[in-house]
């Protein structure tokens, strides 16, 4: 008998026109590490909520079929009966943190189940996820990555046989994402925990998982080994799922869809060995002529701190100097906790610097209220639903223009609705839209304010790859709607394709201000900041080729192999990547 058996399950939420799961069957064995792939709305999260009993015991609806988990028939059991067998880390993991201190939160589940050794169980869980020594810290003092690990510690404190993690890397920087997956790998290999991840990032699936399930339109299309699944390039693309970039590149060069295609970076080094460039001693970077530019924001020697619960100061920004100019398309990058979001809030006037000055069009933000700058700066939140205050998208877009008594605002609203392709959903409540639709609508609301400066916080977080590509096209158009645009993001592909300036932050300081050539060709800088370049860029660097910023770039350089222009002079690296 399999550890998990799902037999012909159909589930439909109340009021929904179509079922979220339609005749779904799936078996998962003990010790598997399996990824569930599919576009937004394909049924991935609904499928996983069957396994811990949240469906149908919390989220009600019409359900048929049978689900057996660790020999427990879930439709006939309680959620508490399944809690010892199934741990779950949700996509919005911060909502799982329910106690003030780290050790209290990690030991909360065993305490609720009456275990006398609940504190020891909590400490053991913290040790497994690498948070030992953080026991007495308050959860709001943790970075985003540490909070995710704490949610994971709480989920494994009951030592479940099955662990489900929804979108493990959606809100994490690359370094913390790898740390989280390394913990999952350890649990799988050392404790035989069955790991189920809902994942859009196929590079992580290739590196860590054993099997993969493809879902589309509420159905399971197939379950296959990772290698067999990720090399089905055409089928995945048809479902708006994108295989690893190196797999796409190899397929484009050979037009052969088989299991010999590389799916990891180490495999790609061997596969593309014949394309490796000769060694060179120098890295050649494009020289640009500096021009005098019009300043929009001038940040001068700024410090910023938050007060902790013990009334001590926690330094967030330290000695930051930065000028934002007209025409800048800036990517603000760095690990969780580097200070990116705080820096953007200072530009809005919502936060005031502890030391130094923030000048917006030569106006000191310390001397004016945030309302003074509302006409000049738009801040689009990481969670787009926070932008919706009315009962329709059109009303939300109109709101600011009406409040400012803008003449002929209806013409501007119509232009924005057309620009962001919102015509069909303009009368719907933004809070009820899909993730991609919400993001488009939030961008439209921001543009409607007609600002000089647009600030976006993680605009592609929590989106599947197909939707991310779609949203990226709309972000490209923002350069025509404002004098400057700044994006705080972990999405290095967006950075590589969109930004004309990249600012790298670490521990509250700016450690580099350059462009994609100066950032992505500098391995020491990438390591220092904990940044992971897009896979296709990394393989081109390791092969000594000119940096490829997209799969198309790599294929073009490879097809022109042998021509001097195909190489940047990057030194050859023979070492394998681990």
Positions of PLM-derived features:
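Helix-to-loop junction immediately C-terminal to a conserved catalytic motif
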Residues: 52, 348
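Conserved ABC transporter NBD signature motif
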Residues: 60-72, 356-364, 373
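Conserved ABC ATPase "signature" region
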Residues: 117-134, 407-425
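Conserved ABC ATPase signature
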Residues: 138-142, 146, 429-433
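Conserved ABC ATPase "signature" C-loop
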Residues: 217-218, 507-508
């Amino acid at each position: 008998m399999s550890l998990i058996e799902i037999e012909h399950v159909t589930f439909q939420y109340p009021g929904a026109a179509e079922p979220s799961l339609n005749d779904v069957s799936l078996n998962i064995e003990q010790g598997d590490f399996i990824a569930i792939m599919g576009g937004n709305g394909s049924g991935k999260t609904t499928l996983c909520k069957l396994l811990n009993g949240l469906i149908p015991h919390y989220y009600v609806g019409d359900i048929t079929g049978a689900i057996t988990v660790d020999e427990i028939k879930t439709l006939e059991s309680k959620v508490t009966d399944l809690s010892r067998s199934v741990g779950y880390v949700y996509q919005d993991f911060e909502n799982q943190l329910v106690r003030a201190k780290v050790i209290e939160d990690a030991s909360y589940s065993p305490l609720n189940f009456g275990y006398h050794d609940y504190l020891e169980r909590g400490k053991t869980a913290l040790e497994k996820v690498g948070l030992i020594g953080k026991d007495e810290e308050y959860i709001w003092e943790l970075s985003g990555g540490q909070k995710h690990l704490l949610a994971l510690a709480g989920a494994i404190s009951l030592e479940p046989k099955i662990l489900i993690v929804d979108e493990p890397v959606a809100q994490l920087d690359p370094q913390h994402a790898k740390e989280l997956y390394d913990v999952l790998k350890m649990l799988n290999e050392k404790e035989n925990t069955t790991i189920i991840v809902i994942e859009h990032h196929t590079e992580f699936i290739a590196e860590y998982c054993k099997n993969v399930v493809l879902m589309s339109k509420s159905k399971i299309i197939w379950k296959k080994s990772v290698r067999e699944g990720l090399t089905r390039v055409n089928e995945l693309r048809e479902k708006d799922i994108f295989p690893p970039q190196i797999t796409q590149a190899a397929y484009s060069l050979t037009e052969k869809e088989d299991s010999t295609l590389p799916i990891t970076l180490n495999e790609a080094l061997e596969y593309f060995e014949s394309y490796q460039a000769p060694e060179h001693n120098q890295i050649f970077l494009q020289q640009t002529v500096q021009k005098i530019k019009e300043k929009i924001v001038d940040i001068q020697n700024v410090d910023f701190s938050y007060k902790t619960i013990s009334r001590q100061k926690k330094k967030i920004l330290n000695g930051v100097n930065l000028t934002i100019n007209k025409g800048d398309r800036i990517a603000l990058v760095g690990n969780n906790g580097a200070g990116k979001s705080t820096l953007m809030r200072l530009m809005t006037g919502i936060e005031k610097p502890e030391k130094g000055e923030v000048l917006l069009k030569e106006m000191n933000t310390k001397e004016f209220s945030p309302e003074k700058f509302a006409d000049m700066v738009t801040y689009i939140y990481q969670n787009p639903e926070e932008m919706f205050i009315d009962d329709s998208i059109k009303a939300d877009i109109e709101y600011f223009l009406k409040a400012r008594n803008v003449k002929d605002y209806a013409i501007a609203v119509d232009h924005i609705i057309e620009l962001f392709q919102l015509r069909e959903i303009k009368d719907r409540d933004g809070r009820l839209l899909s993730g991609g639709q919400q993001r488009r609508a939030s961008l439209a609301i921001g543009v409607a304010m007609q600002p000089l400066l647009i600030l976006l916080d993680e605009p592609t977080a929590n989106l599947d790859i197909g939707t991310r590509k779609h949203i990226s096209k709309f972000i490209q158009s923002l350069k025509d709607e404002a004098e400057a645009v700044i994006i705080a993001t972990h999405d290095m592909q967006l950075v590589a394709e969109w930004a004309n300036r990249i600012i790298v932050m670490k521990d509250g300081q700016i450690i580099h201000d350059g462009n994609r050539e100066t950032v992505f060709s500098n391995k020491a800088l990438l390591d220092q900041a904990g940044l992971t370049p897009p896979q296709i860029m990394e393989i081109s660097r390791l092969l000594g080729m000119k940096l490829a910023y997209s799969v198309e770039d790599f294929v073009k350089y490879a097809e022109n192999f042998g021509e001097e222009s195909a190489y940047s002079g990057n030194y050859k690296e023979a070492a394998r990547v681990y």
